[in-house]
């Protein structure tokens, strides 16, 4: 009898525990649902998308409006320039004393209108000749040539020649003979060799040698 009562009590106890477990599960699942809902809140996605779309449209409209205003300003400048040219022609009694292309060149550049000679300018740029670097020998030779031009005496005038081109003036002939003899005296002597530490340093050589016999 005692055992039967004990079994009945245990059964009733287990039955009373069953609803408690069910309620605990439901509470746990509800809490999990609440947490998931707070993590993945999708209520702000739609407003953000709307704001981004509206902002991009607004920026595009503002940029287009600026372009229109800039274009209107440029065309207004061109119209004002054309009116000025018309007034100049009218004041000059219908005579055109200017080049319309040159006058409108700056305005056309502002409008992005390229003149007729644009392609020609591009072709000319490719034909630019880059000057080559001159060597030291060429520079030295050019200096010598310039010095010779300065030393060359005056050539006989046409008045001292006859019809056949022969010089007949005695004074001119003497001068020519004298200059020819002086030219024959000038020669390059290889007997004396000048040694220097640095090329072109003639001051040091002048200190060592009292006299330089010849220098070219």
Swiss-Prot record:
Record has Coiled coil as a keyword: yes
Keywords attached to this entry: Chaperone, Coiled coil, Membrane, Mitochondrion, Mitochondrion inner membrane, Transit peptide, Transmembrane, Transmembrane helix
GO cellular component: INA complex; mitochondrial inner membrane; mitochondrial inner membrane assembly complex; mitochondrion
Residue stretches in coiled coil: 64-93
Topological domains annotated Mitochondrial intermembrane: 64-216
Record's bilayer topology term: Single-pass membrane protein
An annotated GO BP: mitochondrial proton-transporting ATP synthase complex assembly
Top-rank taxon: Eukaryota
Range of the transit peptide: 1-26
Transmembrane segments: 44-63
Subcellular location per the Swiss-Prot or TrEMBL entry: Mitochondrion inner membrane
Chain ranges on the Mitochondrial matrix side, renumbered to this chain: 27-43
Additional notes on this entry: Present with 589 molecules/cell in log phase SD medium.
Subunit structure: Component of the inner membrane assembly (INA) complex, composed of INA17 and INA22. Interacts with a subset of F(1)F(0)-ATP synthase subunits of the F(1)-domain and the peripheral stalk.
Known role: Component of the INA complex (INAC) that promotes the biogenesis of mitochondrial F(1)F(0)-ATP synthase. INAC facilitates the assembly of the peripheral stalk and promotes the assembly of the catalytic F(1)-domain with the membrane-embedded F(0)-domain.
Protein name: Inner membrane assembly complex subunit 22
Originating species: Saccharomyces cerevisiae (strain ATCC 204508 / S288c) (Baker's yeast)
